[in-house]
């Protein structure tokens, strides 16, 4: 398990204690999982953390400078995802399967969750395997065989996983057993669609996919027009996810939407 301390960034008029404090109090700030990602977002030309009014569509603009290739940028209004941007194209590679797991036992300290386990195929060959988001000698792949892989992993909310390169038919069955998960699926299933298993607990899940982000774009801008006629307070914010599993989250921009009524 490798969990870095998070970073906070503040938009400040000047590099002074007072201006940094004012920027924080105005919510002109965002957080990351530890990477020095640059993130900016505006809605109707007001910046993150601000409160404004609108009687029409909301024009949203954002800019990201990552420290690794960007997997996606997700734009939300409160908990509802409005749009997902992919600066790097996603492509399906039928012979590479990415399996991700995550979760925690509870919200307090000591919430670590063990995912020691492995997977096995009933036919075909595993050509190679790469641990994902495991960077310490204590965790990672233990055994790589022709049809099985075992590993040691522990999460406390972050995602970890494994990328396997296989030569197998669609009928091949993969049996995955780690943490609370005991899962079986056909290779043909994951080749045709992304798979997800929710395991309860605190955001405990496993996913499997043949979709991959292999391009190398670190920087992106995006635009979106929200012309939803919903009345009331809107809260627009952005989540950035990189291929190295680092993330960034903006503070919300609050827009009070007052719908014009025809007289």
Task: Outline where the language-model segments fall.
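C-terminal functional module detector
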Residues: 1-263
């Amino acid at each position: 398990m490798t969990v870095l301390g998070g970073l906070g960034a503040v938009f400040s008029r000047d590099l002074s204690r007072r201006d940094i404090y004012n920027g924080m109090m105005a919510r002109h700030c965002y957080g990351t999982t530890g990477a020095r990602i640059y993130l900016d977002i505006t809605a109707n030309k007001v910046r993150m953390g601000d409160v404004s009014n609108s009687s029409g569509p909301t024009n949203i603009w954002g800019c990201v400078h990552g420290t690794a290739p960007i997997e996606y940028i997700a734009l939300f209004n409160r908990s509802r995802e409005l749009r997902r941007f992919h600066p790097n194209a996603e492509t399906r590679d039928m012979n590479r399967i990415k399996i991700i797991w995550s979760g925690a036992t509870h919200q307090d300290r000591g919430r670590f969750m063990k995912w020691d386990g492995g997977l096995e195929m009933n036919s075909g060959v595993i050509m190679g395997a790469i641990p994902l988001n495991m960077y310490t000698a204590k965790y990672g792949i233990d055994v790589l065989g022709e049809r099985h892989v075992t590993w040691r992993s522990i999460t406390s909310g972050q995602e970890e996983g494994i990328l396997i390169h296989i030569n197998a038919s669609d009928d091949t069955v993969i049996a995955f057993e780690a943490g609370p998960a005991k899962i079986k699926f056909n290779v043909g299933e994951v080749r045709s669609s992304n798979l997800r298993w929710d395991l309860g607990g605190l955001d405990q899940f496993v996913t499997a996919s043949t979709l991959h982000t292999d391009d190398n774009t670190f920087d992106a801008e995006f635009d979106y027009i929200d012309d939803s006629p919903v009345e009331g307070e809107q809260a627009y914010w952005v989540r950035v996810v990189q291929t190295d599993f680092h993330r960034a989250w903006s503070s919300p921009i609050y827009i009070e939407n007052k719908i014009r009524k025809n007289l």
